[in-house]
Swiss-Prot record:
Role, per record: Dephosphorylates 2-hydroxy-3-keto-5-methylthiopentenyl-1-phosphate (HK-MTPenyl-1-P) yielding 1,2-dihydroxy-3-keto-5-methylthiopentene (DHK-MTPene).
Signal peptide interval: none
Homology family: Belongs to the HAD-like hydrolase superfamily. MtnX family.
GO biological process, one term: L-methionine salvage from methylthioadenosine
TM region positions: none
GO MF, one annotated term: 2-hydroxy-3-keto-5-methylthiopentenyl-1-phosphate phosphatase activity
Species name: Bacillus cereus (strain B4264)
Enzyme Commission numbers on file: 3.1.3.87
Protein name in the entry: 2-hydroxy-3-keto-5-methylthiopentenyl-1-phosphate phosphatase
Pathway participation: Amino-acid biosynthesis; L-methionine biosynthesis via salvage pathway; L-methionine from S-methyl-5-thio-alpha-D-ribose 1-phosphate: step 4/6
Length: 219
């Protein structure tokens, strides 16, 4: 049995949710209604996020990148946590509902590209189009966009020990099939609503300390 860690990006690896930051800075007011429909599950994540990015003109590409480079902060302890999982031969994947044009640059030099799974974007038209290369498999009908539970099934064996780290509604389906969940913010609410056991965290020092205990138990 091997330990596999599947970690969200926006609001988990970064302190802020980069998609929401982009919308607040660059999207028109109607983005707020779409965001609320995603959080209430009135819109699927795939449909809602597609609608949000269709509100953003593609000629803002460079401005958005510059804005995120200046404002996005990596959560405390993340660099040390990555070193810890490497030293302990723990598989680590970023599974992000975020977009390639900001996830890759913000993780450059920290996580190899082949360990990052995120959505793709097309800037060839007037507004941003999202592409979904990691959509739901036959076991999921939730129109997740990037389907985290499907990726877990694809990347691991059923007898592996699955750890999910996340913060929001987009991590719920993955949390349902995890052996251990580290949760913060809105994911805590969703875990409690769905009776999913979780360990709360605010920094990756919290996660590392708990994972160290887990390794000692399993040794």
């Amino acid at each position: 049995m091997s330990i596999q860690v599947f970690c969200d990006f926006d609001g988990t690896i970064t302190n802020n949710d980069n998609i929401m930051s982009i919308m607040e800075k660059f999207a028109p007011p109607e983005a707020e209604e779409v965001k609320n429909k995603i959080l209430s599950q009135e819109l699927s994540i795939q449909e809602g996020v597609s609608q949000l990015f269709q509100l953003i003109p593609t000629n803002l590409h460079d401005d958005i990148i510059q804005f995120l480079i200046e404002t996005a902060e990596i959560r405390s302890g993340f660099h040390e946590f990555i070193q810890f999982v490497k030293e302990n031969n723990i598989s680590f994947y970023v599974i992000s509902g975020g977009m390639d044009f900001f996830v890759y640059p913000l993780l450059q030099g920290i996580i190899p590209k082949e360990q990052i799974y995120c959505n793709e974007t097309d800037f060839s038209a007037e507004f941003i189009t999202v592409k979904w290369p990691h959509s739901c498999d036959d076991h999921c009908q939730n129109h997740c966009g990037l389907c985290k539970s499907s990726l877990i099934r694809k990347l691991s064996d059923t007898d592996d020990f699955h750890i999910v780290i996340g913060d929001s509604i987009t991590d719920l389906q993955a949390a349902k099939q995890a052996d251990k969940v580290f949760a913060r913010d809105f994911l805590i609410t969703k875990c409690e609503e769905n009776h999913i056991a979780y360990t709360p965290f605010e920094t990756f020092q919290d996660v590392q300390a708990e994972l160290k205990l887990l390794l000692e138990v399993k040794a």
